[in-house]
Structures are given as C-alpha cells and as structure tokens.
Amino acid sequence: MALGDIWSYPEPFPGIRIDRLETPGMPKGCVKGFTGALSVGSAAIVNDGNAERLELTWDTGKAPYLGLWLNRGHCGQHHVALEPTNAAPDSLRDAVEAWKQFATVEGGGTVRWSVAIRIS
C-alpha cells in the first residue's frame, strides 16, 4: 500500500472487506483511507441484518473529504470511524505537499462547520 493508492470497493486488498468491517489474517489489523473531494457530504454505516444505520451528513464546502478508519485490535482498540475532514490524509504535510487535498484558513480566521448524526 502506497500513499495515494486508489482502493477498490468493497475489497481494497485480498481478504479485507470494508463493507463487512473484516481484516482476515490481520487479527490486530487496521486500515485508514480517504475519499477524494466529495460533492455530497453523506456517509452511513448500515446493519443489513436489521436495517439499523448511523448516518452522517455535512457541508462539503467546508469539509470535502471523508476518512474511513477501520481498527480490528491495533493498540487494543476495536472501532470503525467515518471522519469528515478538510484535508486528506491526516498528516498536514502529506495533505499539502503530496496529496494536494487541503483547505486553508486565513491567519486569525475561523471556519465553522458541523456534522449531523442520525441513528435509525
């Protein structure tokens, strides 16, 4: 896996199923990826067994990217996270110099944005 690789969905790597939150063969594995700039700020985690869902919506004018963090035991933690963001990847240096995916704020300026969370 290299910086800037484009992942296939739902299986970016053999045996790693993002749609099923699986990292077989990596009992303490984790993976983080980012979208390119989105036109619609909406992402959801859906339980196909009972139709429960956790949905996030946000303004892509302020946070045009989405990070997906899937952790299956790294550092003793287990979680999945949907992370709207104004830069990709997490490292500001990489976002600016390598990926060229970032927003700027004028010195002394403020940017406000929000995320709506819906559980159903």
Each model region followed by its residue ranges:
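A conserved acidic, glycine/proline-rich C-terminal tail/linker
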Residues: 81-82, 87-104
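Short proline/glycine-enriched turn/loop segments at secondary-structure junctions
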Residues: 69-72, 101-106
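A broad, structure-centric signal for solvent-exposed, well-ordered loop/edge residues
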Residues: 25, 89-92, 112
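Active-site/ligand-binding surface loops and adjacent short beta/alpha elements
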Residues: 1-60
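Short Pro-Gly-centered flexible turn/kink motifs
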Residues: 103-120
